[in-house]
Amino acid sequence: MAPAALWVALVFELQLWATGHTVPAQVVLTPYKPEPGYECQISQEYYDRKAQMCCAKCPPGQYVKHFCNKTSDTVCADCEASMYTQVWNQFRTCLSCSSSCTTDQVEIRACTKQQNRVCACEAGRYCALKTHSGSCRQCMRLSKCGPGFGVASSRAPNGNVLCKACAPGTFSDTTSSTDVCRPHRICSILAIPGNASTDAVCAPESPTLSAIPRTLYVSQPEPTRSQPLDQEPGPSQTPSILTSLGSTPIIEQSTKGGISLPIGLIVGVTSLGLLMLGLVNCIILVQRKKKPSCLQRDAKVPHVPDEKSQDAVGLEQQHLLTTAPSSSSSSLESSASAGDRRAPPGGHPQARVMAEAQGFQEARASSRISDSSHGSHGTHVNVTCIVNVCSSSDHSSQCSSQASATVGDPDAKPSASPKDEQVPFSQEECPSQSPCETTETLQSHEKPLPLGVPDMGMKPSQAGWFDQIAVKVA
């Protein structure tokens, strides 16, 4: 027991010795002078070179009003409005808060004595320029991803969105800065498959009765190999048939819409063309009605070709020789006797001119008869036409036009009464001729009259005998 008691006493004495030699902790108050080669003890203190003392800093929200010296510590004061100090400092003044946030920014932290104002961009924009305090100075709109592209989960370093192409099985049909690629619709009956920019289109699960007969035209052909009759179509064939059913009405609708436009255009153009033709015809008819009635003054006789005229001459000659051989001679006699009886005395110049013209006409007829007897031994007819053209409404006083036909035969003798033939009046002998009437005579030297069928082969009449008569009258 003795050694144990000794050991307890020894330990107790050692504890008392340790307690007596301990140094109490010292609290250093500012200002104080640091030991050579050492700095101030804590971060809330600073070394004043002028006083060569360690002095206390001002807490956040305050600034240094008076610096320390060898006998007194630093004196601090609170910051004014719209000013702040955020850390322990030895500033002479507080810092100014940032300006108010713009319209495209949102204030996420207000200005106080201990902190600055912080602004952030509103939704749809990103910060293009930041300050050291974390506030945004300039905001810009986020980029938009078009159809076929979606917004990636990560952002660019400046906060702008990143676009990525939609993977197979997904799509994006919008232009947005927030939409991501969405998966395609899952259809039990697929009508139109989807792609990166459009979603899949599903066919109706219960087809209508009108679409059922179309399965005969759009269904896939059966395999050529023989199969049992009781075998039912597999599940792979049904979707293809129903898919074509769903797509058939869409094709027909687009076809009808495409055909209706050309038909309407063609009908409109045709109607416009017919209307224009009708207007042109009406204008032409109105212009024709306005023209005067007397326009054509030249008597035209159709010309018969040589080949047809030769055949017609033979038939005419045979017909005239058999029917009226004596009538032609009588017409010649009547014309001659009428000229002798109606010849006036020499004292009247107009009568003398008519007599000379009648004698010249008889001489010309006799010469034609002699020429025809030596040449072709046939019957020839000479036609002289006097045409009166008048547009006046007064038809009571018009001179009668006369056509004399002379048929010659070398053996015939004139035997006819002068009463059967009338002597034509000259222009001066027409007493009741109205001013509107004009007499035009077909002259051989200006416009030769085409010979008729009976006149083929005859010699043309002597040119200029009407001119000679006109000279004598003058």
From Swiss-Prot:
The chain crosses the membrane at residues 259-288. InterPro entries: TNF_chemokine_rcpt-like, TNFR/NGFR_Cys_rich_reg, TNFR_1B, TNFRSF1B_N. Glycans are attached at residues 30, 69, 195, 208, 224. SMART domains: TNFR. Pfam families: TNFR_c6 (PF00020). It is a single-pass type I membrane protein. SUPFAM superfamilies: TNF receptor-like. One of its GO terms (cellular component) is membrane. GO terms for molecular function: tumor necrosis factor binding; tumor necrosis factor receptor activity; ubiquitin protein ligase binding. It is found in: Membrane. The modification Phosphoserine is found at residue 331. The keyword Membrane applies. The keyword Repeat applies. Residues 289-474 are cytoplasmic. Residues 23-258 are extracellular. This is Tumor necrosis factor receptor superfamily member 1B. It comes from Mus musculus (Mouse).
